[in-house]
Curated annotation (Swiss-Prot):
Lineage summary: Bacteria, Pseudomonadati, Pseudomonadota, Gammaproteobacteria, Lysobacterales
Protein purpose: Hydrolyzes diadenosine 5',5'''-P1,P4-tetraphosphate to yield ADP.
Organism for this UniProt entry: Xanthomonas euvesicatoria pv. vesicatoria (strain 85-10)
Identification of the protein by name: Bis(5'-nucleosyl)-tetraphosphatase, symmetrical
Family the entry assigns: Belongs to the Ap4A hydrolase family.
Composition-biased stretches (Low complexity): 298-311
Pfam families linked: Metallophos
An annotated Gene Ontology molecular function: bis(5'-nucleosyl)-tetraphosphatase (symmetrical) activity
Region called Disordered, residue ranges: 269-318
Sequence ranges of Basic residues compositional bias: 282-297
Keywords from the named record: Hydrolase
EC number: 3.6.1.41
Amino acid sequence: MSVWAIGDLQGCYDITQRLLEKINFDPAQDTLWFCGDLVNRGGQSLETLRLVHSLRAHSVVVLGNHDLSLLAIGARSEEEQRKVNPDLLRIVMAEDRDALLDWLRMQKLAHVDRTLGWMMIHAGLAPKWTTQMAEKHAREVEQQLQGGGYRKLLRNMYGDQPGWSPGLSGYDRSRAIINLFTRMRYCTPRGRIATDDKGTPGTQAQGLYPWFEVPGRVERDLKIVCGHWSALGLTITQGVHAIDTGAVWGGKLTALQLDSEELRVVQVPGREVTGPAPVARAPRRPRERQGRQRSRGNRGNAGNAAAGPKPSVDTPQD
């Protein structure tokens, strides 16, 4: 039995299949940990989501910022859904969209296996969060996503503010937690995220640190595997194992074996970026489904009017 963590797929279905072949993945005995951002930009997001969904009995998934954006898109009106890029549009118009999105909404922000000694997140942790605190805060938001009021959470999750504080409440608290788990790269020693700095360490503004190198951060009792930061490349430092190696940008897709005495890294080449992503043309919604989908979309749209302006639905926050 092997446990493999895999970096950001971002809709690169063919590349994901090649990586699974290279690690000799056997669903009868192996387990996959997906570090989030299953979808968007790679051109094969529907196929990728279906693949991971089909492996749900043999895998663990944490949500990334692109996954949450897909859920937000799926909860909006049909008119708004049609504004997204064709890669994501194919998902929200697919016959099995409800099964895929309902399953995705049930996934975690953080996964912990204390027997194995690992925690998986998508992006980062607040400097003062222990793994126990991180797990507790992740469960807060997961319960909201998995509950009946999830549409309201998805409408209110966008924005860079406020920074994390233990005294936050309501959607401000949920937003701050989501931003830490799914958008973090650099931050201040007090844990305030710098969303505009996305390059390699050394290029950031003064006073900012990679989240895993912040002075005064707490010592953590688990090794951490994460994705999100493709510019960082494969990085193993301070107990953190960052494995988003930019498959969607022409880099590599990386798998890291978590249950071996010596860390084993397996990679395959990423997507060719000389041309457009290999996305199929977005299908028309079947005529017999239009009434039901429009009705569901209108219910969601009633709440959108009070939510104020939102970011473009085809530009997930990084």
